Amino acid sequence: VLRNVDLAFANSLRRVVLSEIPTIAVDIVEVESNTSVLADEFICHRLGLIPLSAKGVDAVEYSRECEECESYCDNCSVVLRLDAKCTGDDIMHIYARDLVIVSQRKNEFVGTPVITDPEGKGCLIAKLRKGQEIRMKCIAKKGIAKEHAKWAPTAAVGFEYDPHNNLKHLDYWYENDAKTEWPISENATWEDPTDPSAPFDFNAKPKNFYFNIETVGTMEPDVCFQGSIKVLQQKLATIIGALQGDPAANGADGYVPQSPGRGEDPGYTTPFMPGGGGQSQWGGAGTSYGGGGTTPGFGQNGQW
């Protein structure tokens, strides 16, 4: 339950939960051998979508910001191996449990395949017949869902703010009984009952929001929500720092993703001015017709 905030803030947290919580997922796959009926890219795609534990992921650096390597290392990645060969007559099933971590991790949790089924098998990766084998090296890296959906920590995120159905959504859309077909939400226990005969206040602003977060297993829902608050705080701190002229706020705090090689560049590089700074071949922030953003035919006040 999120209380005493407005709708915009609640929706901001929802968007952050969906796309900006750091997790870890298989990003690079080196195929050494694959004689199964599945194509290399098919298996690689399945490996990328296997949930890996994000517990302690803050200790892992973003690969693009790692100063110890150019591709991957123990500081910015977790290496897993998949080695399987069918030698019997029966079909061999390859599961997420068959992924073996071979690198030195930052902690004992991050990068571990998430297995929640009672049999302890995990996601099915492929099937092999006699004589077929798969040998692959998987490099898992840190990222967010804005870059690729494989880093998404959640499958669905939603919230409601009218558990008693004061808006009466089904007044004109029901078959037999509106109350039966639109039952009161279980979240209504958090609020006092309302007068069903009272008119709906369309100017009222909701203050209580009831979140429903379904994760893919990489982290717990409460941890995911707390992480969204942290991410939103850091994003706001970056904006405030930039407005105050703090050069360290330009995404250089090791958390906000930035383009490789940008560094402290004050602006974007264009084909007309490789030196960066947001300039063009016509110079400065103005135009070829003069500074100050004016155009021919207009004066300083936008008058003819």
What are these regions (language model features)?
Residues V1-W304:
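Protein-protein interaction/assembly regions in multi-subunit complexes
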